[in-house]
């Protein structure tokens, strides 16, 4: 902090810097000085370390040199990209005054603040991933969450019912910045997020949020968007919009609506499920061997991003899913993949280009890419109209006629413009008469100078005379030192060099003034015309955004058709019964990485067969089998075809996985604690329509504790919840459950032992596995034979000395289960029956009856 006394000791320019920095204490300040952006004090030290640039000094503060670092203005994008990737925010301060007319320091102001969540520059963005900023608000135990994609204008909100749902939503959207209220008290739910930004409570004020949103959308109320009954979500949305305006320092016309995400409209996936199924990120944090890596061959970046949103948010609207299936079938039936994809590829990232147009930050090549995109629409429309597939025809009805806008860009811009408008050469010849005249004047300089040079050589007799130009002295006549004595008297010396003299004559000076004026006028007019292009395009922004969304969807559907054809996928069917029936299903990722043919397997889950106990050896394929069931179900619910011979799937509300676990050292949780936390979430949240995958529950504790927990969890899922469950276990005792409870079935993945080797068959068969094959797998892993031999001896000894035979252990569990079952499932009913039998309604007053009703409610939990 600079004291007032030290502040006054600084130069006016540094005082200006310090005032601007005080307004933006938490961001790096890029301060424009001529052709450089400079940073000072701690900003300079931080930037030098992060960007590997030189740290120098300038002037003094309190007797100490001021640290300084900087970079050329024309190279700033590369430095910004690196800082944004590191999670930093940067305030860009530009010179807006004219140095020639300024008294004191040139006027400067911050024109934008670049943050990880609000960037729109192409160089700063991951091409095939959404770049979202979010805000979260809390009131008691309820939450509001809003998300904004600055690169498309997509603005959404939801109200997670609890912190687990909030955590799952954040895992789905993966925001690069998350704004949270200073009074937020569930930090454990958000601490894993990047770019946490603490904001004051008043930014979440509901009435302010509603006013801001109505002003943004030009509406009187928010009923048209269906969000008026979501106050917590609106509070978060208001803070988010305010932050976006604060950082962009300009209008945001591409943000034209807001929508409400309803949890009941989508299949819910918690954070553990997204991680375990490796949808878009593998367990190592990379993108290889994920569902998206197999499924995403979209030819446009915006299509790729839309597909990933579909994967992370499968929908439950069967009619909409059937429309997607119909579209994929149409594309395949009419052989449209090869016809449509070349044109779609040229559409490119129209969505993000339009965002930059809205922010008036689009560069010349953005506009030429938009022109190219618009040029593809008639060809795409013609292909669809010729084949007349119903769904695709309806999709194209959302795309307006943009022939006028396309013609405008064709007339206005040259074929391949420079990167920036700064130096001109962007507007095409013939677009503006005045610009052509100024250009003709400046471009005619070459011929004029050649004629003047020839004339002066002849009149002076100096054959080495030549005319040149530099930025400092302008035009000049140059004569070598050996012939300088021949220079006419009207030649005025302008510069002396070691081997030559440079002169100026009135005629050349007059022409110089005219040329420089024409170049300046041409550049100023060109910049004006370029800005006017935005004015001409912005009235059509909404229609252009609808078109880009439709083209994104078309790209995804064509991609899914290509994947279905290439990978031999089939169209699944939907039914009303809560069930999953898959014939010869395959894991979509594993089958692509295996060198050997993938062994396809069936699965059938329904009312009479709702929990499968899966046994078999490690490496036998149990986890793959369970994951492929979940992935095939998920693919069906995004509208995709699936890797199977056939699939018939009923209503699913959630998918849960409890597969694998590791220590969460950062939170101080053991493997067993992580496992139990995930299991508790399933037992609390799962319903009869949930698909539940559980792999090896109870491994992280003693054998009897683990077996007891596994048995109790399986029984609870089968008897209380009745969800569709795949339950893999090494506890052979659990295979006795089908004899006691309806709806439980044993299946296993088999293996063959020969001599000391083992062969995994990877085929699912009915019944329980005959043995665990643990020692054979250990030998396969390379455990020394002497250790294997010792293990066999110990195994024989343990089996011989066991206090109970396997049958006796199972019988003991059955008896315990019977007694415990009474305690868990019947005791509640008996106590309730007894309480009701004791009740005499005629003896109760209304107040006593109400109190008794509350007591009965408490008894049932």
Curated annotation (Swiss-Prot):
A GO term for molecular function: mismatched DNA binding
BP GO terms, sorted: mismatch repair
InterPro entries: DNA_mismatch_repair_MutS (IPR005748), DNA_mismatch_repair_MutS-lik_N (IPR007695), DNA_mismatch_repair_MutS/MSH (IPR017261), DNA_mismatch_repair_MutS_C (IPR000432), DNA_mismatch_repair_MutS_clamp (IPR007861), DNA_mismatch_repair_MutS_core (IPR007696), DNA_mismatch_repair_MutS_N (IPR016151), DNA_mismatch_repair_MutS_sf (IPR036187)
Positions that bind ATP: 616-623
Pfam families attached to this UniProt entry: MutS_I, MutS_II, MutS_III, MutS_IV, MutS_V
Gene3D superfamilies on file: 1.10.1420.10, 6.10.140.430, DNA repair protein MutS, domain I, MutS, connector domain, P-loop containing nucleotide triphosphate hydrolases
SS bonds (residue pairs): none
Cellular component annotations (GO), alphabetically ordered: cytosol
Keywords noted in UniProt: ATP-binding, DNA damage, DNA repair, DNA-binding, Nucleotide-binding
Role of this protein: This protein is involved in the repair of mismatches in DNA. It is possible that it carries out the mismatch recognition step. This protein has a weak ATPase activity.
Family listed: Belongs to the DNA mismatch repair MutS family.
Entry-linked HAMAP family: MutS
Protein name in the entry: DNA mismatch repair protein MutS
């Amino acid at each position: 902090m600079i004291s007032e006394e030290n502040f006054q000791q600084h130069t006016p320019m540094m005082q200006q810097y310090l005032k601007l920095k005080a307004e933006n204490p938490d961001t790096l300040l890029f301060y424009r000085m001529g052709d450089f952006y400079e940073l000072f004090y701690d900003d300079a030290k931080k930037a030098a370390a992060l960007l590997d640039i030189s740290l120098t000094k300038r002037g003094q503060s309190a007797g100490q040199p001021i640290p300084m670092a900087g970079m050329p203005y024309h190279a700033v994008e590369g430095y910004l990209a690196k800082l944004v990737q590191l999670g930093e925010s940067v305030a860009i301060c530009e010179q807006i005054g004219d140095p020639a007319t300024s008294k004191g320091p040139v006027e400067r102001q911050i024109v934008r603040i670049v943050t990880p969540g609000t960037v729109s520059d192409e160089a700063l963005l991951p091409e095939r991933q959404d770049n979202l900023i979010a805000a979260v608000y809390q009131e008691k135990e309820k939450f509001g969450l809003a998300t904004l994609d600055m690169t498309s204008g997509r603005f959404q909100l939801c109200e997670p019912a609890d912190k687990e749902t909030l955590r799952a939503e954040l895992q789905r959207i993966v925001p690069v910045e998350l704004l949270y209220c200073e009074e937020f008290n569930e930090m454990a739910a958000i601490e894993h997020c990047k770019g946490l930004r603490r904001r004051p409570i008043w930014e979440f004020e509901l009435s302010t949020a509603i006013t801001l949103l109505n002003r943004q959308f030009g509406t009187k109320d928010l009923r048209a968007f269906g969000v008026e009954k979501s106050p917590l979500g609106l509070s978060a949305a208001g803070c988010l919009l305010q932050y976006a305006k604060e950082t962009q320092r300009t209008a945001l016309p591409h943000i034209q609506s807001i929508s409400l995400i309803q949890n009941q409209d989508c299949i819910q996936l918690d954070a553990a499920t997204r991680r375990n199924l490796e949808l878009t990120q593998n367990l190592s944090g990379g993108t290889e061997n994920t569902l998206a890596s197999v499924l995403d061959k979209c030819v446009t970046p915006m299509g790729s991003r839309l597909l990933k949103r579909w994967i992370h948010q499968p929908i439950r609207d069967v009619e909409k899913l059937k429309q997607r299936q119909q579209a994929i079938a149409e594309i395949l039936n009419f052989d449209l993949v090869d016809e449509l994809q070349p044109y779609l590829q040229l559409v490119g990232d129209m969505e993000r280009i339009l965002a930059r147009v809205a922010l008036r930050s689009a560069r010349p090549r953005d506009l030429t890419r938009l022109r190219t995109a618009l040029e593809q629409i008639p060809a795409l429309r013609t292909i669809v109209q010729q084949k007349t597939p119903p769904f695709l025809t309806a999709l194209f009805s959302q795309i307006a006629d943009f022939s006028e806008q396309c013609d405008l860009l064709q007339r206005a811009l040259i074929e391949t413009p420079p990167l920036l408008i700064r130096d001109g050469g962007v507007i095409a010849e013939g677009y503006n008469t005045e610009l052509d005249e100024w250009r003709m004047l400046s471009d005619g300089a070459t011929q004029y100078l050649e004629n003047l040079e020839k004339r002066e050589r002849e009149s002076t007799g100096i054959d080495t005379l030549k005319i040149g130009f530099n930025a400092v002295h302008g035009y000049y006549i140059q004569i070598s030192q050996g012939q300088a004595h021949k220079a006419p008297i009207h030649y005025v010396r302008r510069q002396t060099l070691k081997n030559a003299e440079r002169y100026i004559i009135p005629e050349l000076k007059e022409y110089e003034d005219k040329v420089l004026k024409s170049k300046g006028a041409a550049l100023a007019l060109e910049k004006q015309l370029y800005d006017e292009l935005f004015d001409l395009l912005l009235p059509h922004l909404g229609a252009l955004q609808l078109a880009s969304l439709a083209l994104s969807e078309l790209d995804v559907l064509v991609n899914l058709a290509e994947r279905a054809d290439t990978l031999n996928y089939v169209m699944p069917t939907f039914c009303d019964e809560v069930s999953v029936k898959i014939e010869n299903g395959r894991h979509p990722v594993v089958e692509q990485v295996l060198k050997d043919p993938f062994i396809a397997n069936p699965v059938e889950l329904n009312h009479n067969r709702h929990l499968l106990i899966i046994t078999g050896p490690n490496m036998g394929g149990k986890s793959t089998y369970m994951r492929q069931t979940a992935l095939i179900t998920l693919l069906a619910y995004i509208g995709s075809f699936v890797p199977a011979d056939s699939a018939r799937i009923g209503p699913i509300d959630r998918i849960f996985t409890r597969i694998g676990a590791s220590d969460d050292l950062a939170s101080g949780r053991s493997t067993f604690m992580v496992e139990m936390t995930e299991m508790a979430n399933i037992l609390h949240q799962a319903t009869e329509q949930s698909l539940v995958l559980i792999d090896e529950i109870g491994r992280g504790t003693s054998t009897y504790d683990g077996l007891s927990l596994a048995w109790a969890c399986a029984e609870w899922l089968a008897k209380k919840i009745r969800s569709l469950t795949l339950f893999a276990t090494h506890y052979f005792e659990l295979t006795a459950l089908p004899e006691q409870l309806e709806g439980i079935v044993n299946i296993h993945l088999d293996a063959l032992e020969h001599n000391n080797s083992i062969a995994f068959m990877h085929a699912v068969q009915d019944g329980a596995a005959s043995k665990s094959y643990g020692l054979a797998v250990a030998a396969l892993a390379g455990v020394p034979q002497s250790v294997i031999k010792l293990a066999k001896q110990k195994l024989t000894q343990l089996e011989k000395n066991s206090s109970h035979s396997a049958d006796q252990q199972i019988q003991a569990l059955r008896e315990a289960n019977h007694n415990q079952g009474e305690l868990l499932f019947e005791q509640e009913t008996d106590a309730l029956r007894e309480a009701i039998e004791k009740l005499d309604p005629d003896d109760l007053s209304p107040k006593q009856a109400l109190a008794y009703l509350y007591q009965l409610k408490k008894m049932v939990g």
